[in-house]
Amino acid sequence: MRLRIITACAVAVSTAAALAPPAQATPKRDRFDVVNLVSDVRGKAAITDPKLVNPWGLAMGKTLWVSNTGTGTATVYSGQGKKERTEVAIPGGAPTGQVFNRGDGFTVKGKPATFIFSSPSGAITGWNAEADPENAIIGAFTRGADYKGLALAETDDGAFLLAADFAGGRVHAFDEDFKRIKLSRSQFRDRSLPDDYHPFNVAVVNGNVWVAYALRDPKTGKSVAGDRKGFVSRFDLNGRLTGRISRVGLNAPWALTAAPRGMGRKYAGALLVGNFGDGTIHAYRGGRHLGALRGADNRPIKLPGLWDLEPGTAATGGENTLWFSAGMDGGKHGLLGVIRPAGAKGSAPRLPGADNRSKSPYGGY
């Protein structure tokens, strides 16, 4: 099947202008604050949620969905981290990557999956509130696969999924019926990389497919951390290799997204890469390393166990923010928060209590 892309339904920079910070707050140029919002550890963040253990993939619909690898669930948050009532169990357990599906494909029990999840068990599952409000449903299963990341795009023939198989060292594709698409030996593959670097994540950012590669320990099946231990390759939306970014700053990279416009002129629209290996976040433009995101103290931001990064919206977090998820203490605990320009406030107000929630018992997803 030839993949001809018309649009990408994954990470993109918001086209809306970021709201200006309040007059009393003067953001420091190219410096950022980290705000902890939710954790399973009491006192670590403003909100305590015992389900938030080793939070991995993030997906933004009307609200923010979080894949909790440690509890086999997906939980939902709005505003500045307020937990919604929706809570979904993921069959196959340990959800990793996650995408929001706007289309009519990828049906589960006759309904299009609103959110789709990948799992190290080789399962890809979908959730629709009408099909089953409390459980995702298995749509595809690949024996022996270890899916660490997931992306969604659209083609002339419909949408398709891309899943990073960390065990097999390949990117797999699935059509809207959750059936595997047979790819050529060169599609979504960087054959010049060392054999022990495997796809750790895949994302669609700024109209390109990006694949993050990490060094895989064959004995444990886990990623290996270390300075410049990682690659990030760029493909067009037909799977043809078109480039590779600098290895400067890479350390078991996983998160891939575009910097929101509200993060300032230097970074707006740049590719942001978050390292699982050392918890730092680096920006790249045209393949060139722009530097690490730094805190107000001018030190590189470090978030131990960093997994995903997701731009905020006017309703959820703010248009000048970047959501992050991290599996603290070696994945035994979890942290969800935002990164925003130093001195700035979130451009979205904290939502009031339950009276303002969606009338749906499953929240506004």
Where are these regions (language model features)?
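Secretory targeting and sorting signals
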Residues: M1-A25
